[in-house]
């Protein structure tokens, strides 16, 4: 978004690989050769001198071990002759997608002063710690990521390439446990699981005819076990995954056997008669699950988790709840597990629990948490429609809009009929008739005789249809549709609602699941007791024993950092208490400037005098907080209708510019007053301001205007300040250069996230966002970029890319590259360290994301300058997990905050964490409502060799620098900002589809450039519209 920057292949002022500067006598930066990654300096010293990245890298902990490349014959024929890794070659030119993929090189040491001689990095010896299939997959994916660099705009392109290699993945080992902070004990919702002492056997299952439904497959297997458990199965009680695998505790009496099982046909929802159907089931021995490897892994003597053994144990413990409850993902729901609550529009909540077996330092643990989700209420269809439309439709026909809404809501839903006595046939709704019931007829014989639906129901069932002006439900297939009047149908119980909830439903669901810590802990314990794992026949069969006590875990409470404010304030710094502080007697460390501003009021119930008074008080608060803020607007406040938002904003903007233009001034800020329920207005306003007008804006809801206390005004001032380029606070330790591995040499901190469309929006792209710090050593101000990419794709495509200009040839680009250049422009320094916080990655995607995104970071760095390889630490941030931490004693006021949650700064890096890898749970925020969810940080790559204390303290301290409030936040700010940026970008593409401004309010986007990617099927993803240059480099997304 925003016009693309001119091509800047290097950190220098122009595109030539030259340097200058005063020292060293050489002319320019030196020669860049793609030979063994060596840099041959022609001179150094001075500000334009040679690169200062040299020497063999310190071996990153764990790490991806690089082998010297040895091409196979076929590969050599395809790729051409390659030189050994450390030999010299002449410069070569590679262009286009057939170029050779670069290595994921380990970073080289990067001292401030350039050396006289630079040596090439040495390849480390290979290790073989991953399964062969993973290594092959990694290599294949790396080869698919082939790309080349353009380092210069000159006629002779200097292109660096690094050869492909095989590699063995090994995430960093834990560098010991942390020691900083006050030690304490907390309880975690993990329950120790004792490993079985039995041999686990796996059998392949083949069912003919083939079944796609897990429910039907389980029904077949349940019947087989019922008939043959004590005979052919040798008394074994097997666990079945619902697809192709069966597991037993010990061998079956055969290696392969075929069974014939007869069941009533599955109810397909068409209403046809169900008949007996016979299935052939073949059970064949496949393998033994190796529990010894699992024991070795849990003891820390093996790096690779034996997923097969963990999967078997997980399936065993899921077998009974799957039979009892409605399973969805790793959760189970039932109306018997807690009270139901209506969500409105025909939906209700079902309570349930989440269950997952996990390898941890204390051994195997079963993670149990409370859960809730939305189900259809088992209502008569007419009652459902009345709730859906929020109006009684029993006395009038439906409008076309109402018909469309009903059809969309009911398509695919199962209903039972009520007009046939005890015969409750079930049908699946495929549509809605366009005609009213009284107008519907159907043929009854081949002679062309027709009968009305009303007449048929009267004659056949003795049922008089009352609401004949309503349409019928259409059930069955399109070739032979059946018509059912709404009044004879009732929604079948137990159908989960998988579409997008509206804001009121989301709010009601959150209220239902929001529990104080003590209550949630009690419910979890009760759920474990209710599940009676000690009586579970499958757990007993396999010898698995589950503790009924929450894990007691050692934790530490990290101290809050001291925050720096402006010297002109009465308080020049402060120490937060329990994760909170305020702006009283303080001034922003760098106040922004707002010399010209306007206000547009879209809230009908806010009078002009009230709007003007609110803006005046807000301007005074901004001034008092340290901003250079004009007290009077350029033009008086103006009311505009929400449906005229574009016309009103553009007209008012041009009126203001007619005044400011002759004075050579720009409009700095728009204040928008919005109704509390503003629909798509918020997103429309942001899109128009940032895309069309190049103007930052601050939206305020009606309730804020009427409440207008100092806290509200102070929070708005914080947001406005960073939107116009100011900084609210910085860490005292950053200013005094006391943050290990951050302030000792130029460091850039990235945050990245991908947001996906809501369920049902199959054509919408996913939005990737990357932000990066633009100040050093303070690391407080962030710029951001966003990119549209293929639907529901988690890997970020546009971290590094090459576009092909017909006149200039290949041009390097990408979000990481542009943010590195922006950092150099802002600070005058080249980053020598990269700390990359990646949000939203599940454990199953760790390898894939690291492979793709670390590779892109490496390419982006190498495209800027030969041998430019800053040391990278790559950390995944996870919030969508189910680990909860509780105070050991809820009545101890010194160990809980006001909400009853554990204190901010509580960190856990033992017992419930990974057996060997570098991860930790950090609760960095004070609870407000409900039970706090700690963030989980997992280090996937670490060339900076962080200690546990250094990374935990850095992460916790950064959580106090979030720009929008005077509270520490729950995840590290760069990841938070990336999340906001991705959501803001969706407004630019979906300005008409937002259901509610309340969801949108406060979510923003990053400084960004218009980007386009290709979908997996080859279709172009619609590019994001361009952001104006005047808002690109400020934190307007706050």
Curated annotation (Swiss-Prot):
Residues 115-134 have a biased composition (Low complexity). The keyword Transport does not apply. Residues 380-493 form the PAZ domain. Transmembrane segments: none annotated. Belongs to the argonaute family. Ago subfamily. InterPro entries: ArgoL1, ArgoL2, Argonaute_Mid_dom, Argonaute_N, PAZ_dom, PAZ_dom_sf, Piwi, Piwi_ago-like. Probably involved in the RNA silencing pathway. May bind to short RNAs such as microRNAs (miRNAs) or short interfering RNAs (siRNAs), and represses the translation of mRNAs which are complementary to them. Residues 669-990 form the Piwi domain. GO terms for molecular function: RNA binding; RNA endonuclease activity. Keywords: RNA-mediated gene silencing. Residues 18-29, 43-52 have a biased composition (Gly residues). PANTHER family: EUKARYOTIC TRANSLATION INITIATION FACTOR 2C. Signal peptide: none annotated. The keyword DNA damage does not apply. One of its GO terms (biological process) is regulatory ncRNA-mediated gene silencing. It comes from the Eukaryota. This is Protein argonaute 1D. GO terms for cellular component: cytoplasm; nucleus. It comes from Oryza sativa subsp. japonica (Rice). Residues 1-58, 110-134, 992-1021 are annotated as: Disordered. The gene is AGO1D. SMART domains: DUF1785, PAZ, Piwi. It holds the Pfam family ArgoL2.
């Amino acid at each position: 978004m925003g016009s693309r920057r001119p091509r800047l292949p290097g950190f220098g002022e122009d595109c030539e690989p030259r340097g200058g500067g005063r020292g060293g006598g050489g002319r320019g930066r030196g020669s860049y050769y793609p030979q063994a990654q060596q840099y041959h300096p022609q001179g150094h010293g001075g500000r334009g001198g040679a690169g200062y990245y040299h020497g063999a890298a310190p071996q990153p902990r764990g790490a991806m071990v690089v082998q010297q490349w040895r091409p196979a014959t076929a590969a050599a024929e395809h790729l051409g002759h390659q030189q050994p890794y450390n030999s010299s070659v002449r410069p070569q030119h590679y262009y286009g997608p057939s170029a050779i993929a670069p290595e994921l090189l380990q970073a080289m040491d990067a001292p401030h002063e350039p050396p006289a001689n630079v040596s090439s990095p040495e390849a480390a010896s290979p290790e073989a710690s991953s399964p062969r299939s993973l290594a092959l997959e990694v290599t294949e994916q790396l080869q698919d990521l082939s790309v080349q660099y353009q380092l210069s705009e000159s006629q002779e392109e200097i292109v660096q390439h690094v050869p492909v290699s095989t590699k063995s993945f090994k995430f960093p080992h834990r560098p010991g446990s942390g020691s900083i902070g006050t030690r304490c004990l907390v309880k975690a919702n993990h329950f120790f699981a004792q490993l079985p002492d039995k041999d686990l056997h796996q059998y392949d299952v083949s069912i003919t005819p083939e079944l796609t439904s897990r429910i039907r497959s389980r029904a077949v297997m349940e019947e087989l076990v019922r008939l043959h458990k004590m005979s052919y199965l040798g008394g074994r009680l097997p666990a079945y995954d619902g697809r192709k695998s069966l597991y037993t505790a010990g061998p079956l009496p055969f290696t392969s056997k075929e069974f014939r099982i007869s069941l009533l046909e599955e109810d397909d929802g068409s209403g046809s008669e169900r008949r007996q159907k016979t299935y052939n089931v073949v059970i064949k021995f496949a393998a033994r699950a190796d529990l010894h490897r699992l024991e070795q892994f849990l003891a820390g003597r093996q790096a690779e988790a034996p997923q097969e053994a963990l999967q078997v144990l997980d399936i065993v413990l899921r077998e009974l709840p799957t039979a009892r409850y409605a399973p969805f993902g790793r959760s189970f729901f039932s109306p018997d597990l807690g009270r139901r609550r209506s969500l409105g529009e025909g939906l209700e909540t079902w309570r349930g629990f989440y269950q997952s077996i996990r390898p941890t330092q204390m051994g195997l643990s079963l993670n149990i948490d409370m859960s809730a989700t939305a189900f259809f209420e088992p209502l008569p269809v007419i009652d459902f429609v009345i709730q859906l439309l929020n109006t009684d439709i029993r006395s009038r026909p439906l409008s076309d809009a109402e018909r469309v809404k009903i059809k969309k809501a009911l398509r695919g839903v199962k209903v039972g009929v009520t007009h046939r006595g005890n015969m409750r046939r079930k049908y699946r709704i495929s549509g809605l008739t366009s005609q009213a019931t009284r107008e519907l007829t159907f043929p009854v014989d081949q002679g062309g005789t027709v009968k009305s639906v009303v007449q048929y129901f009267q004659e056949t069932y003795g049922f008089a249809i009352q609401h004949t002006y309503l349409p019928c439900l259409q059930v069955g297939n399109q070739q032979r549709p059946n018509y059912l009047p709404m009044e004879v149908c009732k929604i079948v119980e137990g159908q989960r609602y998988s579409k997008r909830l509206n804001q009121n439903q989301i709010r009601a669901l959150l209220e239902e699941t929001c529990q104080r810590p003590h209550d949630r802990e009690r419910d979890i314990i009760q759920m474990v007791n209710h599940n009676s794992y000690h009586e579970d026949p499958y757990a007993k069969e396999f010898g698995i024993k589950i503790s009924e006590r929450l894990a007691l875990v050692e934790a530490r409470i990290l101290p809050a950092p001291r925050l720096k404010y402006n010297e002109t304030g009465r308080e020049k710094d402060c120490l937060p208490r329990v994760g909170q502080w305020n702006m009283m007697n303080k001034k922003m460390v760098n106040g922004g400037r707002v010399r010209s501003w306007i206000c547009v009021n879209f809230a009908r119930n806010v009078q002009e005098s009230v709007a003007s008074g609110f803006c005046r008080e807000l301007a005074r608060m901004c001034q008092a907080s340290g901003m250079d803020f004009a007290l009077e607007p350029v033009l008086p406040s103006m009311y505009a209708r929400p449906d005229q938002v574009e016309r009103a904003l553009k007209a008012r903007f041009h009126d203001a510019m007619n005044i400011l233009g002759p004075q050579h001034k720009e409009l700095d800020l728009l204040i928008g007053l919005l109704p509390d329920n503003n629909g798509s207005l918020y997103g429309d306003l942001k899109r128009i301001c940032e895309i069309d007008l190049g103007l930052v804006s601050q939206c305020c809801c009606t309730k804020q205007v009427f409440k207008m206390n100092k806290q509200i005004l102070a929070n708005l001032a914080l947001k406005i300040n960073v939107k116009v380029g100011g900084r609210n606070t910085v860490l005292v330790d950053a200013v005094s250069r006391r943050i290990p591995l951050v302030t000792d040499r130029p460091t850039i901190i990235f945050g990245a996230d991908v947001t996906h469309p809501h369920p049902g929006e199959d054509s919408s792209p996913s939005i990737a966002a990357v932000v990066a710090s633009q100040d050093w050593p303070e690391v407080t101000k962030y710029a951001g970029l966003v990119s549209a990419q293929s639907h529901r794709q988690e890997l970020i495509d546009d971290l590094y890319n090459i576009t092909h200009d017909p006149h200039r040839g290949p041009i390097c680009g990408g979000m990481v590259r542009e943010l590195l250049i922006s950092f150099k422009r802002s600070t005058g320094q080249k980053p020598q360290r990269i700390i990359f916080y990646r949000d939203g990655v599940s454990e199953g995607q760790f390898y894939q994301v690291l492979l793709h995104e670390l590779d892109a970071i490496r390419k982006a760095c190498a495209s800027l300058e030969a041998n430019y390889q800053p040391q990278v630490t790559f950390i995944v941030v996870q919030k969508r997990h189910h680990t909860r931490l509780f105070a050991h004693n809820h009545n101890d006021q010194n160990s809980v905050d006001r909400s009853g949650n554990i204190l901010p700064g509580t960190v856990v890096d033992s017992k419930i964490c990974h057996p060997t890898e570098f991860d930790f749970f950090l609760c960095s925020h004070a609870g407000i409502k409900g039970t706090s969810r700690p963030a989980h940080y997992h280090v996937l790559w670490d060339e900076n060799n962080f200690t546990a204390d250094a990374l935990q303290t850095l992460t916790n301290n950064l959580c106090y620098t979030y720009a929008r409030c005077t509270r520490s936040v729950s995840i590290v700010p760069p990841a938070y900002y990336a999340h906001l940026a991705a959501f803001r970008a969706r407004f630019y593409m979906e300005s008409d589809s937002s259901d509610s401004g309340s969801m949108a309010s406060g979510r923003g986007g990053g400084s960004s450039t218009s980007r386009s990617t290709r979908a997996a099927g080859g279709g172009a993803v619609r590019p994001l519209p361009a952001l104006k240059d005047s808002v690109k480099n400020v934190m307007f997304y706050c």
